[in-house]
Amino acid sequence: MDSDSTVTSLEENTENFCTNPTRDILAEGITNLFKPTIERLDERVASTIQLQAELRGQLDALAAQLRDIEKAQSQIPEFADKVKELLNVKHKVTVISNVLVTSQERLTGLHKLIEKEQRRRQALLDSALSTNIS
């Protein structure tokens, strides 16, 4: 092994890490760039979770009412099958709701990226036109 190693000590790396203003500014800029999007996404996820919990509660209440009706009218044998179908529908509604929410969030993000790209291209075009006119 070479005794003249170029590897720096942990203390030197820690010093460089702590006193790098360019890195700090860049990190702060990146954080500020993503923070609003992450906050909106977090709010939407929380809202969706709450709405799904409410829907699940309503479907559970309906299923309980149907079970009570089934007990009261036990002479209708196909009614139990309808309760099972309702529970299957409840599961499907939950899955579809999750897919739709995810798709909507992705489409919203894509739409924002498209608008941003259009503004950037328009600014470049305006800049090029003003340079050519001058």
From Swiss-Prot:
Keywords, comma-separated and alphabetical: Coiled coil, Cytoplasm, Membrane
A GO BP annotation: synaptic vesicle exocytosis
Subcellular location: Membrane; Cytoplasm, Cytosol
Pfam families cross-referenced by the UniProt entry: Snapin_Pallidin
Segments forming a coiled coil: 50-124
One GO location term (cellular component): secretory granule
Family: Belongs to the SNAPIN family.
Name listed for the protein in its UniProt record: SNAPIN protein homolog
Record lineage: Eukaryota, Metazoa, Ecdysozoa, Arthropoda, Hexapoda
